[in-house]
């Protein structure tokens, strides 16, 4: 009985460790990928930059993309 309890605890610890490593090992989002729902997942040299979308002065949505840090993007006509 003690052996079964010990084995169960060891298996639980191993599964918990594997899940923790899987969460920490998530791949990061590369440049120009959408990060609206995952702002902290951009690769280390990128930042999740968000822009509001407006129509007739009312905000209709928001887009976020992984972009280079310190780079300023301007609209072209």
From Swiss-Prot:
Q: In which tissues is it expressed?
A: Expressed by the venom gland.
**Where does the source fall among the domains of life?**
Eukaryota
Please name the GO terms that the record assigns under molecular function: toxin activity
Q: Where in the cell is it found?
A: Secreted
Q: What protein am I looking at?
A: U8-lycotoxin-Ls1o
* Keyword annotations: Disulfide bond, Secreted, Signal, Toxin
State the similarity comment: Belongs to the neurotoxin 19 (CSTX) family. 08 (U8-Lctx) subfamily.
Identify the stretch annotated as signal peptide in this record: 1-20
